[in-house]
Regions:
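Conserved N-terminal beta-strand and adjoining loop/helix that marks the start
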Residues: 1-14, 87
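A conserved beta-turn-beta hairpin within the catalytic core of GNAT-like acetyltransferases
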Residues: 23-26
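The catalytic Nudix box helix
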Residues: 30-63, 86
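Active-site-adjacent beta-strand/loop module that shapes the phosphate/pyrophosphate-binding cleft
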Residues: 67-94
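NUDIX/MutT-family hydrolases
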Residues: 85-87, 96-128
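Acidic/histidine-enriched, glycine/proline-rich intrinsically disordered or flexible terminal extensions
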Residues: 131-136
C-alpha cells in the first residue's frame, strides 16, 4: 500500500495524531494515510490532513520515502506500506481530530518521547526538525 504523511511544524512543535484504528491503534503518528486510486501524492496528503486534523496545508517537498512492514505474532506480514513523507505548511482550517484520528495535537519537540510512537516515526520527525528550513 502506498501512503503519505505530513510533517507540519509550528516553531518547536509538530502536529501529531493519535490513531483511532488498527494498525497501531492508540499510538501517535504523523497525519496521513493511503493514496486513493487516481489521486496524486500531493492531493492525498492534503486530503488526509484535512480529514484527520481539519487543517488545510501546502506540501513543500518530500522529506523521506519510508518502508514499513508490520508482522503478526507469528511473524507473517500483515501490513506493508511505502510511505512518502512531506514537509508541509498549514494554510488554514481549524484544528480538530476527525476520520480515523482520535486526537490531533501540537506536540513540543522535547515531549515527543513521552508519546507512544514508533522509533521509525521518531526518526522521520527528527530528520524533519533538522531539515525543515530547506523547505519554503
Amino acid at each position: 500500500m502506498v501512503g503519505v504523511g505530513a510533517l507540519i511544524f509550528d516553531r518547536n512543535r509538530i502536529l501529531m495524531t493519535q490513531r483511532g484504528k488498527e494498525p497501531l491503534k492508540d499510538w501517535w503518528s504523523l497525519p496521513g494515510g493511503a493514496v486513493e486510486t487516481g489521486e496524486t501524492l500531493e492531493e492525498a496528503v492534503r486530503r488526509e490532513v484535512r480529514e484527520e486534523t481539519g487543517l488545510e496545508i501546502k506540501p513543500l517537498g518530500v522529506l523521506e520515502i519510508f518502508e514499513r512492514i508490520l508482522r503478526d505474532p507469528a511473524g507473517v506480514p500483515e501490513y506493508h506500506y511505502v510511505l512518502i513523507d512531506y514537509v508541509c505548511r498549514a494554510t488554514g482550517g481549524d484544528l480538530r481530530a476527525g476520520d480515523d484520528a482520535q486526537r490531533a495535537e501540537w506536540v513540543r519537540r522535547p515531549d515527543l518521547r513521552k508519546l507512544q510512537i514508533t522509533e521509525g516515526t521518531l526518526g522521520v520527525i527528527e530528520k524533519g526538525f533538522q531539515n525543515r528550513r530547506k523547505y519554503r
